Amino acid sequence: MKNENLQQKHQTVSSPIVVALDYASQQAALSFVDRIDPQDCRLKVGKEMFTLFGPQFVQTLQQRGFDVFLDLKFHDIPNTVAHAVAAAADLGVWMVNVHASGGSRMMVAAKEALVPFGNDAPLLIAVTVLTSMDEDDLRGLGITVSPAEQAERLAVLTHNSGLDGVVCSAHEAQRLKQVCGQAFKLVTPGIRPAGSDVGDQRRIMTPVQAQQAGVDYMVIGRPITQSADPAQTLREIRVSLLNGASS
């Protein structure tokens, strides 16, 4: 089960920023991590880094004081996903995700697998429509509605399955809060501070725009990880969010 101190720590990190780690070298990743403060952000570990470095890397980040969002987007038969989610909870992660397109039975099985963990269970969220996808991409999959409509369908399915929230585009946030309620967590990639390169995320917003739209957690990668002074960049984003909230 999770370290007893992890849940208390999860509750003390107030920052909505989740930094997406994207390194081919564990040494480079840790060199970056050691330049930032765990009170300023959480960290996201995706498929590439988890495959390269394994659960031990997640534990190393936790030992440095960071909450970890394990972004593996589980999508399989219900029993397999349930066991995978339970394994993530055993690892002590703060958040884990599945693909909503796996269906309600799969999501319910995943949620039920976390019941034994009680208050120590990670947040369980589902991926709706990837932020790199537009209407043409969906049409190629035989889906004839807009990304926003598809995201809403999958978000409602996720909410009805008892999960904590979804990964979505910031452009859908306001509508999803209306449909699924204010307690339903929205996690948004494709966030770029003003002046940043758009990269491969087509549907983007700035942190302040995302916050105003109702986003709970914003995933930011290269604008922070490639910054000459990532700690300062994080501070500037947090200040902009505080100013945006008070304006």
Curated annotation (Swiss-Prot):
Biological processes per GO annotation: 'de novo' pyrimidine nucleobase biosynthetic process; 'de novo' UMP biosynthetic process
Binding site for substrate: 22, 44, 71-80, 131, 192, 201, 221-222
SMART domains in the cross-refs: OMPdecase (SM00934)
Active site: K73
InterPro entries reported for this sequence: Aldolase_TIM (IPR013785), OMPdecase (IPR014732), OMPdecase_AS (IPR018089), OMPdecase_bac (IPR047596), OMPdeCOase_dom (IPR001754), RibuloseP-bd_barrel (IPR011060)
GO cellular component, one term: cytosol
Reaction(s) catalysed (UniProt annotation): orotidine 5'-phosphate + H(+) = UMP + CO2
GO molecular function: orotidine-5'-phosphate decarboxylase activity
Swiss-Prot/TrEMBL keywords: Decarboxylase, Lyase, Pyrimidine biosynthesis
Pathway where this protein functions: Pyrimidine metabolism; UMP biosynthesis via de novo pathway; UMP from orotate: step 2/2
EC number, as in UniProt: 4.1.1.23
Gene3D superfamilies the UniProt entry points to: Aldolase class I (3.20.20.70)
Function summary: Catalyzes the decarboxylation of orotidine 5'-monophosphate (OMP) to uridine 5'-monophosphate (UMP).
Quaternary structure and partners: Homodimer.
Family classification: Belongs to the OMP decarboxylase family. Type 1 subfamily.
Protein name stated in the entry: Orotidine 5'-phosphate decarboxylase
Native organism: Pectobacterium carotovorum subsp. carotovorum (strain PC1)
Gene encoding the protein: pyrF
